[in-house]
Amino acid sequence: MKNAKRTLALLLALVMSLSLLAGCGNQDNTSGGATTDETPLVVGYSPFSSKFSPFFSETAYDQDVYAMTQLGLLTSDRTGAIIYKGIEGETVNYNGTDYTYYGPADLEVVENADGTVDYNFTLREDLKFSDGEPLTVDDVIFSMYVLCDPTYEGNSTLYAQPIVGMAEYRAGMTTLSKALAAAGRDNTDFTNWTEEQQTKFWDNFDKGLVPFAQEICDYVVSAGAAAETDSVAAKASQWGFTLADDATVEDFAMAIGEQYGWIFSAMEAETAGSALSDLMDADVYNDYPVMGVKTGESADSITGIKKIDDYHMTVTMTKVDAVAIYQLGISIAPMHYYGNKDLYDYDNNSFGFPKGDLSSVRAKTTQPMGAGPYKFIKFENGTVYFEANENYFQGAPKTKYVNFLECISDDDKLNGVTTGTIDITDPSMSSDTADAIATANSNGELTGDKVTTDLVNNLGYGYIGMNSVVMSVGGEPSSQASKDLRKAFGTILSVYRDVAIDSYYGERASVINYPISDTSWAAPRPSDDGYKVAFSTDVNGNDIYTSDMSAEDKYAAAKTAALGYLEAAGYTVADGKVTAAPEGAKMEYEVWIPADGKGDHPSFM
């Protein structure tokens, strides 16, 4: 029923797209004439959300903004491999060329006899933030404690790594919204919160989250996915929620809250129209999900994060974890800016902010600062302004000024380049985009006097998602019959991938068979043992296709295989047609294709 964000299972990887990077062909097409040190580099960007925080950013575009200002504890080479000797630098060959990489720290990894692992960091001693303040281990520790705070709700998962003492530190504390929801509206113990706070929470639940859930039920009915007389559970199932048969709309609202850890802003993803923020009081919506409440005993510090001196520290993990090292490469945020230096006393377990209170960090969400190559100046009238950081450890960038300019659409990005108001941007590549670029250039090519293009592999892929609750037999998503139903659809949809992608992208994209971009080193290859084309076997495990089949032969073979899956799922199949559905399944399912609301999608054939 819902858009791709609500899919419960990956069906298949449709396409590994190619992105376009477009820039001015020559200086005559820039907006400012002759280039000088004062001329900014203008980059066309998709819209921002103003969460430019190394801790709380959400969109990739906001992350790019803060990344301009930040310095990561670790750096990597062009293949993603970690650089362990960042201070002296490491030289690594890539495609026949040697590249030397520098970073703010050296890292030594020691596997101990007891199974624990020490990550020993040594920082450069000349690092400074963009405001001139020195960067030390204290800033690293502050940043780690923010990411590991019990009330932290950002995208980092450092707190989930097997760091010694992490569980003990995060125990005994939760957020006010979680605690109130767990206690229930009839709670009479006001040790950890006031009666007024509890009353306000449930008042907002009734006037905000319950109508929010009811609107979803109403939408499902209006869309024809359920009848008005159907139960709340039946309506909620169309939205991906499994509830008891006798569930009320209040139960549905509770399920939404629990799904998102009682973070109201995150619940907005479930909207059927209204913004939850418009239905609730601002303080409950914004503050309750991030306000720490002590519920029991907890450790005062994370024993596995140890300061040795101002430039040396060790992080100890309980076991070897291949991906943990990547989680340690955090942005080193300035404690004096995001926290409070007066509240930092390592020896007395104080780390720059009160445990359970990240308000000082959140207050700087829209104005990032760090030790990265650029300083954030302002975000004004749709433009983010940066200036080179004179204190950057590798020297100030040669391009003194950089502007990120918001563009509403890909057309805006392309028009900006052709008119000279944008120097470089990344519109999504399609045949229409390619035609527009060729038309702009006098030579009719993708690179010419107006626009220079550079096609790069996109580290991503498209896919079709199927809601396993909706597409099930007998209300049992995990049953074999339900799986066979979904495999029938997967078999039919997958066989048309080649023609869909070829007609829309041409040579600019390729079909993949596993949910991982072909640009990744971990992507399966056709030469690997066990490699299979997606949905290429029938219900008995036999291959559907042969190498000499024409496209039409493949379509016919896929149809036969799909009918076999449907029959196994309990459907009635006669003379190559499906005539009846089993109980708890349907003869018709709805497919949603976003396509920017104008059919701009390879699935529109």
Functional labels for PLM-detected ranges:
Residues 78, 265-312, 316-321, 329-401, ...:
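Gly/Pro-rich hinge or "lid" segments in bacterial periplasmic/extracellular proteins
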Residues 25-27:
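Bacterial signal peptide processing site
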Residues 377, 385-387, 481-605:
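Append "and occasionally in soluble cytosolic enzymes with long acidic Gly/Pro-rich linkers
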Residues 19-23:
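C-terminal motif of bacterial Sec signal peptides marking the signal peptidase cleavage site
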Residues 44-114, 369:
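N-terminal lobe/hinge region of extracytoplasmic solute-binding protein
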Residues 37-47, 118-121, 140-143, 313-314, ...:
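Short, well-ordered beta-strand elements
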Residues 105-276, 314, 416, 478-481, ...:
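Aromatic- and charge-enriched surface segment that lines or borders ligand/interaction sites
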Residues 45, 377-390, 403-472, 496, ...:
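Extracellular/periplasmic solute-recognition and catalytic clefts
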